[in-house]
Amino acid sequence: EETYMPILEVEHISKSFGKTEVLKDISFSLEKGQVVSIIGSSGSGKTTLLRCLNFLERPNTGIIRVNDDILFDGNNPATWQESQVRKKRLHFGLVFQNFNLFPQYTALQNVMLAKELLAKEQSDYKEHKKEIHSQIQKQAEGLLIQMGLKDRMGNYPHQLSGGQCQRVAIARALALQPDILCFDEPTSALDPELTGEVLKVIRELADNKTTMIIVTHEMAFARDVANHVVFMDDGHILEQGDPIELFEHPKEERTKQFLSRFSQDEY
């Protein structure tokens, strides 16, 4: 029988900005190939949680483990050394809500950039420069084709729609082959008619067993694509569990209130 082997374990993470406690004792785990949706009203700490996982914010307390390696331990400052933090970030890919593409680079260059910078740090880069470059380019082209952007590789961000930019951003995150792909409200900056094309790509990634954490306002999507849903409220995880269970039989009054704002046909 298969043993439950979490790819990610988050234990007792807390985070304050000044006197404001934004994350309060957050714990959850994620299995390889699983999708977790994080829902909750604005200001509940969802984005801060993603930023902590991606080593963009330093938690005050708690432990983050990936593949059984302790990446962060609040009691051990040595786990947060600038030199290591960059490397630790590579376990996670983060897709931001407003794409954050570089305007001066084409779609293809945007996807290749991080990988090229990493390659330059390898000792054998100079002698294998050509092969490395063409390998990276080939991989980037493959990802853009997978995103349905075969004809857009040479376009700059200003020549692309929001939905296309977001798909370039997804390809860019995938290029580094992260263990876990994180999305922060991937559709909230898009026109409603472009939302579908981005959700479709994320759904395909889920079907291909990409391990993902998705912070989203799209309730139908959260329920549909996730194996596990986490409801955050005021910096706490108030309730978490199976999507159908949580959406149809929420245990907490606050969860019921939150979900009642979305009509049933939305999920």
Predicted features by range, described:
Residues 175-179:
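A short, proline-enriched helix->beta-strand linker immediately N-terminal to the Walker B motif
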Residues 240-241:
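ABC ATPase "signature
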